[in-house]
Amino acid sequence: MQELKPIKEGKVREIYDNGDSLIMVATDRISCFDVILHNEVTSKGAVLTQMSKFWFDLTKDILPNHMISVDTKDMPEFFQQKKFEGKTMMCRKLHMLPIECIVRGYITGSGWESYKKDGTVCGIRLPEGLKESDKLPEPIYTPSTKAEIGDHDENISFEQSIDHLEKYFPGKGREYAELLRDSTIALYKKCAEYALTKGIIIADTKFEFGLDEEGNLVIGDEMLTPDSSRFWPAKGYEPGHGQPSFDKQFARDWLTSHPGNDWTLPQEIVDKTIAKYLEAYEMITGKKLEA
């Protein structure tokens, strides 16, 4: 069997070239504060891949996506090893657009910090009197530039996103910026409405898009996972403070309260983190993870 090497390795994913397609492996690595931790979180990669598959299937009436298959039998022999099962996706090749498409339905995190200062989030003025974790009257689109690994993404205004896209696609900056904004909000609205019926609030999330060979907009990367989104339990939701969440907040909190930790988590924190990921997956999909 031929040993294959990834053509690109991110903090969590490995990308392999498969001729006319790509193969994307979500590893069990976990990153916090842009640092890859020494621990691996068993089943995390499978949660990311299978949850993305669920959302891709749910939203294909709104926009096509890059997923071809998550069945390793459809892939080269190298990916039929046990270690790739459940966490591997064969995808269409896309020309990725240089914008991270962030949508916020609730005010929290960096958005809340910004609002407290001047009543705006990423340059968008919001109503007075909002409390932390309040639902916004309408979801807001707050794009950012895509940074190289090790750098931070930079929040930009909608107008700046037009200029940024214009550099890559002369004469099409506004058209693509509007398409990204409208698609992002439409996807968020459908998925947030669905998640609420399953007891989960999607406070905010991030999408990435690319163009196929015909120039059509296609959803790429991952979709609505605990790595790219804030999921809150609807039960007990109460504005006025932060909310418990189904993500790596356990890990972040432990690292913050234990300086000099060498970027290694105790097993108890690893176990709590994956329990949250699995709980979110099971609530949203209605089934146990098969991996």
Where are these regions (language model features)?
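Coil-to-beta-strand transition motifs
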Residues: 21, 96-98, 199-202, 214-217
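Anionic ligand-binding catalytic core segments
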Residues: 117-118, 125-175, 219, 223-284
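Intrinsically disordered, low-complexity acidic/polar segments
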Residues: 33, 112-113, 214, 228-230
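Generic recognition of stable, solvent-exposed alpha-helical segments in well-folded globular domains
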Residues: 46, 50, 175, 179-182, ...
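Conserved metal-phosphate-binding beta-hairpin within the catalytic cores
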Residues: 103, 202-223
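A long amphipathic alpha-helix within ATP-dependent nucleotide-binding catalytic cores
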Residues: 171-203
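Active-site loop/lid in soluble adenylation, ligation, and acyl-transfer enzymes
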Residues: 1-148, 261-291
